[in-house]
Amino acid sequence: MKRLLITGAAGNLGKILREGLKGYADVLRLSDIAPMDPAGQGEEVVPCDLSDRSAVHELTKDCDGLIHLGGISVEAAFDDLLQANFLGTYNLYEGARKNGKPRILFASSNHAIGFHKRTTKLDDKSELRPDSLYGVTKC
């Protein structure tokens, strides 16, 4: 793989993947609106607000794969969640599609599936029952 994009690269999981995926692609393109360590060998650091459609279109250019971890990961005002998590995800998918690179790994949340009895077995067909406004944006 030539170039792999990781959004939310300044977050906990993003930092783990940044280290763990070194060498998997020729270049790891790392993006977040939060500060990150400078680019190392085989890395590009590209700050980007995912709610900015044209910036996201540029961000996804020349990427062979995308790992989407970006957005707000806690409960917040619904308008903020919509911009970061819903519109940001939409822009990322559209940027990838328009650039001919439709492969995206999307990290959702247990808050999208909501509360179930501990004994309930859940699978990909289980009903979504978001437990918060944050959960709604991760469905």
Predicted regions and their residues:
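SDR active-site strand-loop-helix element
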Residues: 7, 31, 66-70, 104-110
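Conserved glycine-rich Rossmann-like NAD(P)H-binding loop of the short-chain dehydrogenase/reductase
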Residues: 23-37
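Rossmann-fold cofactor-recognition segment
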Residues: 40-52
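Active-site helix of classical SDR
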Residues: 136-137
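Conserved Rossmann-fold NAD(P)-dependent oxidoreductase catalytic core, especially the SDR/UDP-sugar
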Residues: 91-133
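N-terminal Rossmann NAD(P)H-binding glycine-rich loop of SDR-like oxidoreductase domains
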Residues: 4-24
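NAD(P)H-binding glycine-rich loop region in Rossmannoid oxidoreductase-like domains
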Residues: 50-84
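NAD(P)-cofactor binding segment of oxidoreductase domains
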Residues: 66, 76-105
